[in-house]
Amino acid sequence: MRTAQALAVCIFTAAQTYAVPPSVILGILHVEGGRVGMASKNTNGTHDLGPMQINTIWMPELARHWNVPEATAKRMVRDDACVNIGVGTWILRKKMNETGSLYKGIAWYHSATPRFGDVYRKKVMTAMQRYRLVRDPKDLVAAAVPRPAKRSPG
């Protein structure tokens, strides 16, 4: 188990690496509600893993990048909070770049289907405001500028 201080280092490192506001990472962590070692089964047969509930659809790409079997990538993402946070933040940055927007990136982290993604984005924004991570969503405008996603997830 990691200490709160170690997790804070993971969050701030991921935020810096992928140019994502730490408050957004914390908001997603709160909404996802995952834990180290957790694997939640989805109706489509995939699983969501660990604190940021990373979908197993990402395992082939991660396994190739890390040059490990998919089962190893899955264990790493599920069982290591820092790896999970790094991968989740990398995915969020990719979605931000695809959509050209922080807000749509947050929605697409969950689903590119507007009726699901928009509800999710609102939950993340509400969590950030509730925990006083931001005063107003406009505080995040500077983060909306697309940047290249680094090639290394996690």
Per-segment meaning from a language model:
Residues 1-153:
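Catalytic glycan-binding domains that act on GlcNAc-containing polysaccharides
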